[in-house]
Amino acid sequence: MLFVAGSGSVGGVRSQRVDIAVIGAGPAGAATAIQAARSGANVVVFEKAAYGRDKVCGDGLTPRAVGALNELKIPLDDAHLIRGLRMIAGKQVRELDWPTTGKFPNHGAVWPRRRLDAALMDAAVEAGAEIVYETEATPVIYDNGRVTGVETNGHRFDAGLTVIAAGAQGAVARKLGADRVPDEPFGLAIRTYAATPRHTDVHLEACLSLKDENGTAIPGYGWMFPAGDGTVNIGVGALSTMKGFKKLNLNTLLESYRHLVQDDWDLGPNLERPRAWRLPMSTQRRHGDGWVAIGDAAGLVNPMNGEGIDYGLESGMLAADLFLDDPATAPVRYDQLVGERFDAFLRTGRRFSFLIGHPWILKPGLRLSVSTNAIANITLAVMGNLVDSTTPGAAGRVMKLADKSLGLVDPILRKTRAAA
């Protein structure tokens, strides 16, 4: 049963009653707001930045993400549609189209986050949600650990469910004990934009054999994501499991990669200063009494590509649906269903990151990943976030086998990892 919105005052602090309070107005938080508000829930979203803010990101949308946007009825007229992925490992190049399945669309997209996030928040407002910009909100936690809403600027919003959608774990997550697991991997990435005549290319490009300025192989990849507007999003990402990770200079790595692709893409000068961000890949908790964490805040990022927009959209919609069905059981059911859908695949990805953190495994592994069309199609499915617990066929079988196999050697891989 949904609450009736109301207001009052407690101890001099103004209070307002809502169904759902969301902290963070990225894709995950917007998905919750849209889904819940369209069904009549009273939703308020708090975003610390201004409307139309940019969000540092690769801007690529997988077919899974496009499917979620379709479910939310978000038109992609402003996005550049993408037909597939070009994977490069050394001298080997495989250009494959996204598969045609009944589960996801056969196309992805590139949609700069400034425009994507604005479209999502506009849809949330149209659905009836309230968006409060340039405002930081913190959870209200009682002595028994229950979260009863949020507080901001002397105003308290009592909520049936508080949704943490603030991206990579920060102060809010730490307050709830939902920070990342210390011993688990995470990623760092950096990107910029450049002009290119190839901006209408219909394939994303991923260089799996990424190297630093000294020629050292890096567990991660470089990307060229054509935006269709005269520019390409160019970036690199690396995993924390690599040797010397703490000394890694992302700006230098990006420049090395840019030099590699300069001629092929006929790149113009950088259009803005390169910006970096952290990719969370685990969390100590993703729910509690009265709250759930979604998207990046829940560690829902594929360790093998750093992508999490699709998981953010899906987890955001799931949180809303479960609350609408039964507010009392929503947090526990959310944790269970997210675990059933994603945990095995993401666990395999984290274990895989320790595997390729060993240089003697990384190089032959990369060659193998695109060695044949059959294997490359499995790599395509993994890179496209098309694999989860329900995936049929070769990709699903390989990931289940990998989960079991890597589980056996995971303790050894962790103990023998090189110093970061």
Give names to the regions the model predicted.
Residues 66-119:
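A conserved beta-strand/loop capping segment in the N-terminal third of enzymes
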Residues 321-420:
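C-terminal helical "tail/cap" subdomain of flavin- and related membrane-associated enzymes
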Residues 37-57:
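Glycine-rich FAD pyrophosphate-binding loop
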Residues 18-44:
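N-terminal Rossmann-like FAD-binding beta1-loop-alpha1 element of flavoenzymes
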Residues 2-17, 296:
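A short, basic/flexible loop-to-alpha-helix module at the beginning of a structural domain
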Residues 123-263:
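Predominantly flavin-linked oxidoreductase catalytic cores and closely associated redox partners
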Residues 28, 51, 169:
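Conserved Rossmann-like nucleotide-cofactor binding loop
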